[in-house]
Amino acid sequence: MDTTSRRAVPELGRAKREAMIECIASIRELAEINPAGFIKSEDKTVFPGIEPGTLEKFHARAKLLATPDAKPYLRAPVRFPAAELELFFDIEVDPMRDVCYLHGFVERRGADNATEQFVAFFSGEDTAESEEQAFAAAWRYLLASQPCAIYYYSKYERTIYRKLRSKYPHVCSEAEVETLFDPTRAVDLYCDVVLKATEWPTRDFSIKTLAKYLGFNWRDPHPSGAASIEWFDRWMTSRDAAVRQRILDYNEDDCRATRLLLDGIRALARQS
C-alpha cells in the first residue's frame, strides 16, 4: 500500500489535508505523530477545523494503514436488534429518469446463511405507475415480514423511501415510514455502526471495499451503482432478459455483502 499520500485515510478530505500539509505530509507521518503534541485546548488543535478527537481518529486510521497485516477493531460497543428474521435491503435508482427501479432484499432466518433467499421488486418501466407498483409491492412485503430487523448501508434507502412516500401517499403514511426506519429495528450499518464504532485498514469505508476486505466477491466484473443505471438504460431499450438479470444479480450481491459485513462486525464484537 502506498503510505505516502494522506488521501487514503477515510474521511480525511481535501480541506483537512491542506490544513495539516505543513506538518504532516503522508500517512506514515500521520501514523507516527503524538496527537497530544498538536492539541491546543479541549476543543482545538493547531490545525484549523480539526478538533482533538478528529485528529486522534485520523491518527488511528493512519496507523492501521501503515501497519502490515493490521486488523479491524471496534472502538465502541455495538448492539443489534434481536430478531429471528433479518432483511438486508438495497435499492437502485436512476437519477436521470428520477425513478427507483429496484427494491432488493436478502432475507435470513436464525442467523443461518442456508436460509437466505433474495426477494426483488423490479420496476420494468420508467413510468410513475410502474415505480409506484414496485414501491407498493415492496412495502407490502416489508409489512408482511414484521417483526424483523432491517439492515441497509447509508441513509440513501431511508431518503428514497421518504421521497417515494411523498410521491405515492396512499401506499403508506409518513409515520409508517419513520416507524419502519426506527433505529431499534432498522440499522444503517454505515452511519450508525461503521463510522461510529469501527476502524478498518482500508482506504475507504464503502460497502464494496469492506465486503471485499472480508472476502466477498461480486459476480459481475464491474459492479457499481453507476453500472446498474447503465444496465437499466439498456433494459429500457432492449428488454433483454439477461440485462435484467444482471441488474438483479448485482443488487442481490450488494444485499449479501451487507449481510457479510454485519457478520464481520459481530465477529469483531465477540473478539473484543
Regions found by a protein language model. Name each.
Residues 118-229:
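Conserved DEDDh/DEDDy metal-dependent 3′-5′ exonuclease domain
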Residues 10, 14, 24, 85, ...:
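Conserved structured core elements
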Residues 1-8, 14, 210-272:
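Acidic, Mg2+-coordinating catalytic module of metal-dependent nucleases/exonucleases
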Residues 81-86, 91-134, 140:
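Metal-dependent catalytic core segments for phosphate chemistry
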Residues 2-60:
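Helix-hairpin-helix
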Residues 35, 92-94, 110, 155-156, ...:
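An acidic- and aromatic-residue-enriched active-site/binding cleft used to recognize and process polar
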Residues 33, 89, 108, 151-154, ...:
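Generic beta-strand/beta-sheet core signal
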Residues 50-87, 91-92:
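A contiguous, basic/glycine-rich beta-loop/short-helix subdomain that forms a polymer-engagement track
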